[in-house]
Amino acid sequence: MKHIRNFSIIAHIDHGKSTLSDRLIQVCGGLTDREMDSQVLDSMDLERERGITIKAQSVTLDYKAKDGQVYQLNFIDTPGHVDFSYEVSRSLAACEGALLVVDAGQGVEAQTLANCYTALDMNLDVVPILNKIDLPQADPERVAAEIEDIVGIDAMDAVRCSAKTGVGVDDVLEVIVAKIPPPEGDPDAPLQALIIDSWFDNYLGVVSLVRIKHGSLKKGDKFKVMSTGQNHTADRVGIFTPKQTDKTELKTGEVGFVIAGLKEIHGAPVGDTLTLAKNGADKPLPGFKKVKPQVYAGVFPISTDEYENFRDALNKLSLNDASLFFEPESSSALGFGFRIGYLGLLHMEIVQERLEREYNLELITTAPTVVYEVVMTNGETIYVDNPSDLPAINNIEEMREPIVEANILVPKEYLGNVITLCIEKRGTQVNMVYHGNQVAVTYHLPMAEVVMDFFDRLKSTSRGYASLEYNFIRFDPADMVRLDILINGDRVDALAMVIHRSNIRHRGLALVEKMKELIPRQMFDIAIQAAVGSQIIARSTVKALRKDVTAKCYGGDVSRKKKLLNKQKEGKKRMKQVGNVEVPQEAFLAVLKLNE
């Protein structure tokens, strides 16, 4: 056990984490040069394309150190993006130390900071590493000072390397051996193993990545999943070198995989504890929290006969993504679909893109909403994630909206823009600290404002330099109302949205004007109204097309024309009573665009 080192890498997007891991694998000879592929660990096409890491992965490498000993390095890859922070906290729970990789040109970013604090809270040893020193704009001295100033860990003797050219990678390996402590655990205690991640393999069933905290797990052992209480047999155990390699047992402190032929991922929830079926441990390992979706949206297939395929696709996707939540939903305008819960906007985009790409579905997504806490007049509290489920106004005592604490790091020349944006989004400033050239601002913002377009706006007002990290803190009472769109007096459920009372005039007007352009003209007038409760706040009318019924009369008496015009008038009146209006799909999409 003295020769095991478990570590993960904390880094902001694009600071070179995946490239560094490629180098470590190459130096330790995990893959031959021919098999080496850039970003080995990002196995999803989407991960490669966007250059981000989504799922946690692990690799076990043997490294012969300068002191002549062979060390087993277990490296657990973590995502760097704010939406996947739960994946990060889980990866960190399996380690004793973390490498803090910072781009020597760009310096510290907000998400790096957030994940770094998570690591320090878990009592991990954080080892700073300055990457990309081959770049002309690299300034390792300044960045080292910035790490000390902002993160508060000693960084003057931080290892300097360039993962791309391979300079200094050996020093990184030495520092892992020297600075990161070996795992602690009792090999003779009952088995306790943390599930870091699970994914679904078409041939093997569910593959779980585990870290053995105490005891050991042998091939053929019967084990129990603690949260569900079910027993399974370990058909295969082993490690990734990145290639899957079978072993006879996983010992204390090691990280590896277990395959038990499970059919669905919920049988081995991520973050859960495994123990032996006989003489098992009494209590699970700490740190298992069920992850709650923060953002909900209705998703509908464009053609209704795709519904079955859509359902299968979601089921398959949720095999790999334990944080995905979905339930069937039907809408009078869009047909049958699902209400899907996501961790955040990036997660939402990625899920939608994977559905469209891997399963060839064409989908429409309604505007994302957050979960509101509603206190009813009869005293009960309900949670609502869909605007059309909101009770009538007179039954609501008060509405509370979720508030997030957003930590923003921004260069000081853009501070003014960022503050203006936060105020416009109804934020309250909590804290502001200057660190050299960067400013760390903390705001409490309504989550509904953050999920709409906050991130994009933040990036554009700061020319891409600001970085954001947020987490949910509490529900606060707020004056929120539901804005309905009525077409000829009928509510269109897919267009309802929950917004703050101060925005309703502006939003209502913009919506009805937009709808007016998109709904095709009929033979009768169509009234488009925006309403809150029973109060109409904006209206526009799509004028009727007129057929010239008097064209065939020339000359003659005026009463003849009057008769024809009156007949037309009667007909229009009748049509207006029975005619219903098809709302084209462009109209729905336009409303979603309007939020941006």
UniProtKB/Swiss-Prot annotation:
SUPFAM superfamilies: EF-G C-terminal domain-like (SSF54980), P-loop containing nucleoside triphosphate hydrolases (SSF52540), Translation proteins (SSF50447). It is found in: Cell inner membrane. Residues 2-184 form the tr-type G domain. It is a peripheral membrane protein. InterPro entries: EF-4, EFG_III/V, EFG_V-like, EFTu-like_2, G_TR_CS, LepA_C_sf, LepA_CTD, LepA_IV. It catalyses: GTP + H2O = GDP + phosphate + H(+). GO terms for biological process: positive regulation of translation. GTP binds at D14, H15, G16, K17, S18, T19, N131, K132, I133, D134. GO terms for molecular function: GTP binding; GTPase activity; guanosine tetraphosphate binding; ribosome binding; translation elongation factor activity. One of its GO terms (cellular component) is plasma membrane. It comes from the Bacteria. Keywords: Cell inner membrane, Cell membrane, GTP-binding, Hydrolase, Membrane, Nucleotide-binding, Protein biosynthesis. Its EC number is 3.6.5.n1. Belongs to the TRAFAC class translation factor GTPase superfamily. Classic translation factor GTPase family. LepA subfamily. Required for accurate and efficient protein synthesis under certain stress conditions. May act as a fidelity factor of the translation reaction, by catalyzing a one-codon backward translocation of tRNAs on improperly translocated ribosomes. Back-translocation proceeds from a post-translocation (POST) complex to a pre-translocation (PRE) complex, thus giving elongation factor G a second chance to translocate the tRNAs correctly. Binds to ribosomes in a GTP-dependent manner. PANTHER family: TRANSLATION FACTOR GUF1 HOMOLOG, CHLOROPLASTIC, TRANSLATION FACTOR GUF1-RELATED. This is Elongation factor 4. It comes from Shewanella putrefaciens (strain CN-32 / ATCC BAA-453).
